A protein has these predicted regions:
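Conserved N-terminal helical subregion
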Residues: 2-4, 47-167, 171-184, 228-247, ...
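Short helix-loop capping/hinge motifs at secondary-structure junctions, enriched
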Residues: 61, 187-193, 228, 256, ...
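Active-site substrate-recognition segment that forms the wall
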Residues: 195-231, 250
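Histidine-centered metal-chelating micro-motifs
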Residues: 160, 180-182, 205-208, 294-295
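Conserved mid-domain beta->alpha element of the FAD-binding
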Residues: 7-22, 26-33, 153-154, 181, ...
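C-terminal helical "tail/cap" subdomain of flavin- and related membrane-associated enzymes
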Residues: 2, 65, 80, 301, ...
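Residues at the starts of beta-strands that form the adenosine-phosphate
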Residues: 3, 26, 216
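Flavin-binding catalytic cores
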Residues: 233-267, 325
């Protein structure tokens, strides 16, 4: 039986491990974090194409009961004017729509399912290097141990070590010029329909919120930030700083943003975010990248998790059907690259719209309604309607099995 080592137990890693096991490859996942350390970040949306890809592997149930449906988004200007409403993707045939869920719940559910299916997940195992050896790939870990497997999958996120190993000259990830913050406010009246995202292009910053079942308000904020913060800079600014900063940004808008933030208990943190416009080498010497390691996208795309899941499923199909490992990786890249790079580009455009200056803001508010209409129709066709057929054979050099 062939063996695989997957680096990273975020979203792509556990799903890839399940797909590889189904393809007849015994898989171990090595994750840098210690078991108890749960993931930073508040919540994310999983779109219908991501849910469909989970179902392709027979694991759609993992997201049932841990999130809530969020079928649509309403865009407003800071004056409260409605600019447009788009769906988060046409429902799947059984009526399922995109869901919003806590990041930590999604990670845990995927890890638990992988372990239930016989995948070994080792925590506290940080990959530091890897190289091709006669009988496969030898991975070296920070704890001094080595493991050899037939192939290695880099599912180690935007700051991927595997990416550097595959291409030591790979450019670093690109800073996205808005920060990300988020939280959960207790039930309160914000005048919004449950499950519908309210997305506000405020005068100074973008703000999004959605009412969850039970009435609590899940929110995120995008303070503009032109230059990349120094390491540790954001963490050194405490909750009082961020509360004051958000108040300054949102007090000029006619939205419930300040009330929501004031009602949010606990600490507030900000994250810098990055994307990867085009990673030139996805694979080499039996090592391959998937998920954010290959194509990190701005959170504005709302697709990073779904694309990571799609990657994992397609990699499983390619390794199942294409006997030679590096040829299977080339087939995988052929199936995935143009699709994910289109999403990265769309995400970057959305982030820039969030950080617009005064003139661009006026134009945006004029043209956004038209753009949203067009974008909504286009996304329905190629983005959300994407379906992977697990049973369709992959032929090296062809793109069979996806629509
Ligand atoms: C603020 C924010 C909001 C977002 N919102 C959304 C959203 O609404 N919808 C959406 O679809 N996407 C969203 N995303 C993007 C989404 O989170 C990512 O696209 C997704 O997590 C990618 O999954 P991944 O498995 O490739 O990487 P990750 O989830 O980052 O997982 C990588 C894993 O690898 C581990 N690792 C790293 N280095 C090593 C190493 N050397 N050795 C071993 N393990 C290692 C890490 O600890 C981590 O567990 C958001 C991102 C951010 C930052």
């Amino acid at each position: 039986m062939r063996t695989a080592l997957v680096i990273g137990a975020g979203i792509a890693g556990p799903v890839a491990a399940i797909a590889l096991q189904r393809a007849g490859i015994a898989t171990t996942v090595c994750e840098a974090r210690a078991d108890a350390a749960d993931e930073a970040g508040a919540f994310l949306t999983l779109q219908v194409n991501g849910i469909d890809a989970l179902r392709t592997l027979g694991i759609g149930h993992v997201v049932e009961g841990i999130g809530f449906p969020t079928p649509s988004m309403r865009f407003r200007s800071g004056t409260g004017k409605l600019l447009g409403e788009v769906s988060t993707g046409a429902p799947l045939p059984d009526g399922t729509v995109g869901v919003t869920l806590r990041r930590s719940d999604l990670y845990r559910a995927l890890r638990d399912e992988a372990e239930r299916q016989g995948v070994t997940i080792e925590h506290g195992r940080r990959l530091v290097d890897a190289r091709r050896v006669a009988d496969g790939v030898r991975a070296e870990f920070a704890d001094g141990t080595t493991v050899t497997a037939d192939l290695l999958v880099g599912a180690d996120g935007v700051r991927s070590r595997v990416r550097q190993v595959i291409d030591p000259d790979a450019p670093p990830a690109r800073f996205v010029p808005v920060l990300n913050m988020g939280g959960f406010a207790p039930a309160m009246d914000v005048g919004a329909a449950p499950g519908t995202y309210e997305m506000v292009f405020g005068k100074r910053a973008f703000f999004g919120y959605v009412v969850a079942p039970g009435g609590s308000v899940w929110w995120f904020a995008n303070p503009p930030q032109r230059t990349e913060p120094a390491p540790g800079e954001l963490a050194s600014l405490g909750t009082a700083h961020w509360r004051a900063r958000l108040r300054e940004l949102y007090s000029v808008d006619r939205t419930p943003a300040c009330r929501i933030i004031d009602a949010t208990p606990g600490e507030l943190r900000a994250w810098a975010t990055y994307d990867l416009p085009s990673v030139r080498r996805w694979h080499r010497d039996r090592m391959v990248l998937i998920g954010d390691a290959a194509h990190a996208m701005s959170p504005s795309s709302g697709q990073g998790a779904s694309m990571a899941i799609e990657d994992a499923v397609e990699l499983g199909r390619c390794l199942r059907d294409v006997p030679e490992i590096d040829t299977a990786f080339a087939a995988f890249e052929g199936l995935r690259r143009s699709r994910v790079e289109q999403v990265v580009a769309d995400g970057a455009r959305s982030s820039n719209a969030k950080a617009a200056g005064p003139v661009a803001r006026v134009l945006r508010d004029l043209f956004l309604p038209i753009f949203l209409k067009r974008q909504g129709d286009r996304a329905a066709a190629w983005l959300h309607g994407h379906h992977i057929d697990w049973d369709a054979p992959v032929v090296a050099g062809a793109g069979a099995g996806s629509r």
